[in-house]
Curated annotation (Swiss-Prot):
PANTHER family: 3-HYDROXY-5-PHOSPHONOOXYPENTANE-2,4-DIONE THIOLASE, FRUCTOSE-BISPHOSPHATE ALDOLASE CLASS 1. This is 2-amino-3,7-dideoxy-D-threo-hept-6-ulosonate synthase. One of its GO terms (biological process) is aromatic amino acid family biosynthetic process. It comes from Methanococcus aeolicus (strain ATCC BAA-1280 / DSM 17508 / OCM 812 / Nankai-3). 1-deoxy-D-threo-hexo-2,5-diulose 6-phosphate binds at D33, H34, G35, V36, S37, Y153, P154, R155, G209, G210, G236, R237. The gene is aroA'. Pfam families: DeoC. Catalyzes a transaldol reaction between 6-deoxy-5-ketofructose 1-phosphate (DKFP) and L-aspartate semialdehyde (ASA) with an elimination of hydroxypyruvaldehyde phosphate to yield 2-amino-3,7-dideoxy-D-threo-hept-6-ulosonate (ADH). Plays a key role in an alternative pathway of the biosynthesis of 3-dehydroquinate (DHQ), which is involved in the canonical pathway for the biosynthesis of aromatic amino acids.
Length: 271
């Protein structure tokens, strides 16, 4: 895949092909790590059903914590990639923006992971520790041939707007500078400003799915991010909390991989 031409580690390249579409060179990831931060939220009470639904809808990968792997493993149907999240923090913590490492790269390898992810909140009181963690994990991932996704969010006292293009561009570049292979971050809200974010980051960028919105608004955001040079989407609540999980996953994949119009993609969602 051309976007990963700068990666020479064969192990990373083989694993990346399991979470990216080889033709479009883009990805649809469904994060399902919310149980740690928020508890068993709607849509994720039955993890096996949730994972089965997005797999049947054509998602490239799910992203979960280590304890969920055994509960969501699929022995049938469509293949789906596995990304194991290494960071944790809860919404009831004294500092919800603090993330600590709870899983090792080696443990993720033993579980069959195709990639690992780390969460960093740029601007949080403990952000320097998160930077250190990311840098160390990047070194370990390079050694083992494990792709690393950095979830890079501008969040903290000095962050006036988490979607501000300058903050988003800084967060994305920070993740790439510290060794991440793929960056997940906020969409800035318009194509031109996100183009600048993509231009300033040497690693491919996928956008977060954002807050719950209408199907049309969500799919338009995804389409705009792709037009701006994004490499896909990692969408949680807009997918797994949908009344037609399979349909919205299919629609997302159509926009990301087939460059479908929003109106066309909306037709596959059951009303």
């Amino acid at each position: 895949m051309k976007m990963f031409n700068n990666i020479k580690n064969t192990g990373k390249l083989i694993r990346l092909e399991r979470i990216f579409d080889k033709k479009s060179e883009k990805t649809v990831i469904i994060p399902m790590d919310h149980g740690v931060s928020s508890g068993p939220v709607a849509g994720l009470k039955d993890m096996r059903t949730a994972i089965n639904s997005v797999a049947e809808g054509g998602a490239n990968s799910v992203l979960v914590h280590k304890g969920i792997v055994r509960h969501g493993h699929r022995g049938y149907g469509k293949d789906i990639g596995l990304i194991i999240h290494l960071s944790a923090g809860t919404g009831v913590s004294p500092d919800p923006n603090e993330k600590v490492i709870v899983t090792s790269v080696e443990e993720a390898i033993r579980m069959g992971a195709d990639a690992v992810s780390v969460h960093v909140n740029m601007g949080a009181p403990t952000d320097c520790q998160m930077y250190q963690d990311l840098g160390k994990i990047a070194e370990t991932c390079e050694y083992w041939g494990m792709p690393l996704i950095a979830m890079m969010y501008p969040r903290g006292e000095k962050i006036t707007d988490e979607k501000d293009p300058e903050f988003v561009a800084h967060a994305a570049r920070l993740g790439a500078e510290l060794g991440a292979d793929i960056i997940k971050t906020n969409y800035t809200g318009d194509i031109d400003s996100f183009k600048d974010v993509v231009k300033g980051c040497p690693a491919p960028i996928i956008i977060a799915g954002g807050a719950k919105s209408t199907d049309a608004e969500y799919l338009q955001m995804v389409k705009d991010s792709i037009e701006a040079g994004g490499a896909g989407v990692a969408s949680g609540r807009n997918v797994f909390q949908h009344k037609d999980v399979i349909g919205i996953t299919k629609a997302t994949a159509m926009v990301v991989h087939e460059n479908a119009d929003v109106e066309e993609a909306l037709k596959v969602i059951k009303k």
